[in-house]
A protein has these predicted regions:
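Short helix-capping segments at alpha-helix termini
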Residues: 82-85, 108-112
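Active-site metal-binding loops of divalent metal-dependent hydrolases
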Residues: 12-13, 65, 96, 165, ...
Length: 222
């Protein structure tokens, strides 16, 4: 299984873009699933320039509704419409963003060709996404308006079966899944082989926290 866990910094300038930097946008690749974190103006242009898979993004997380963090979103959503996207898109953001986006489509007399699902964030410590590999939890930021960071936690991978043990104990295929989950091997003669003799520890789990505009507080350290 792929162990991809990579962040692409698409923009990092504060408040306004500069001649060299765009405002806040990041793309996280985890096991070839792509998560967009904030979407400032120029985001889709930068993604094209960086040859990032813009159409593979299915989940967008917006920290707050100051323009330098979301003003590129409407353009990206319209581009998805024009490019014929049909796959559902999930958008996580504080209250208010759905109204803004729906207004943009309404006044231009467009209806998106793909489903958009808005998930409104009200508080920190809220798990907003989970799949077989990762969870995403909100973090309340200290800012003038409702603002949230997002903590991506990788789930613990299954244990790795040792090739020598697989051959030595002639492990049946139907027991491999249980052994990778940490269970011991029970042989036909009743012998119990401890799991630690059969497997190796998996790689350590990783995490990534996207914390945007905020005042300092020690609660973020954990």
């Amino acid at each position: 299984m792929s162990r991809n866990f990579r962040t692409y910094i698409i923009g990092c300038s504060a408040a306004t873009p500069t001649s060299e930097r765009h405002t806040t946008t990041q793309l996280l690749n985890h096991h070839n699933k792509y998560f967009l974190l904030d979407c400032a103006e120029g985001a889709q242009k930068q993604m094209r320039r960086m040859r990032l898979p813009m159409m593979k993004i299915d989940h967008i997380f917006i920290s707050h509704l100051h323009g330098d963090h979301y003003l590129g979103l409407a353009g990206l959503l319209f581009s998805y419409h024009l490019l014929g996207r049909t796959k559902a898109l999930h958008i996580y953001a504080p209250d208010g963003l759905q109204e803004i986006i729906e207004l943009q489509f309404r006044v231009s007399d467009h209806k998106p060709a793909y489903p958009m699902h808005f998930h409104i964030i009200y508080e920190g410590g809220q798990q907003v996404f989970e799949d077989k590999n990762i969870t995403v939890e909100t973090i309340a930021m200290n800012h003038r308006i409702p603002t949230f960071g997002y903590l991506f936690r990788e789930k613990q991978a299954l244990r790795n079966i040792r090739k020598d043990a697989l051959e030595y104990y002639n492990i049946p295929i139907e027991q491999i899944s249980n052994i990778k989950s940490g269970k011991d091997l029970v042989r036909e003669n009743g012998e119990i082989v401890p799991n630690h003799k059969l497997t190796k520890d998996p790689p350590a789990s990783r995490s990534f926290a996207f914390c945007s505009d905020t005042g300092y507080t020690e609660q973020y350290v954990d």
